[in-house]
Amino acid sequence: LLETTPVTHGPLQVYRFKDGLLLLQKADSSGASEGSVVNHFAVEARDMGATLKKLKAAGFDMPTLKPGAAGVFIYGPGGVKVEVMHNPALKANAASHHIHFCHADTVAMQKWYAKTFGGKPAMRNKFEAVEIPGVNLTFTDFKAGSAPTRGRTLDHIGFEVKNLEAFCKKLEAAGVKFDVPYKRVESLNIGLAFLTDPWGTYIELTDGLNRW
């Protein structure tokens, strides 16, 4: 799908594609991404037909792409849900598109992400959304509630932040609590921090990960 060669960093396999990194680590999972706060993530593919053929050849149970449909959902190992969307105008083979949250408190989520990360509130089709450079955050009203992400197949999401140490100090001054406060990891040449949003989404913040 991403047509990229993974780079190994310790226990991590890192896949780079336009505007995003996908990090894989072998671990036990408490459940699929569907049913958690982050229901799925979406990528765009320039050649949808070729992409679906490759996924089918790789063993994925592929749904039929309906005429006029913008994309399809596939389920990877461990139940990670991925939406593949068609964008023939894309210059790269694949690119990140959106992260899709499911929770009953969508308006509050939209406000929190816009304020915390300096995003622009918007609508994506019928959904509340926030535009952040490189990715769209989409929020769907899900009355049944959703489980926290930590420990599930899609364990956390992440954002690359310039001057992360100063950014973390700003969040702390605003009352944000960190699970892992800002620190430098010299062996990886990055700065990082972890926090959990008010609805249970585990979030990694990095400074330098985009150089991997």
Question: What spans do the regions from the language model cover?
Answer:
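Vicinal oxygen chelate
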Residues: L52-F101, M123-R124, A129-I132, N136-F142, ...
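Short, surface-exposed ligand-recognition loops at beta-strand->loop->(often short) alpha-helix junctions
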Residues: V43-D47, F101-V107, E160-K162
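Amphipathic alpha-helical segments
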Residues: L1-T5, A50-A58, D105-P121, A173-A174
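Short glycine/serine/proline-enriched coil/turn segments at secondary-structure junctions
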Residues: A32-S33, L90-N93, A147-T149
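Post-signal peptide N-terminal segment of secreted/secretory-pathway proteins
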Residues: G31-S33, F41, R46, A50
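Short loop/beta submotifs within extracellular cysteine-rich repeat domains
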Residues: T5-P6, L22-L24, G31-A32, T51, ...
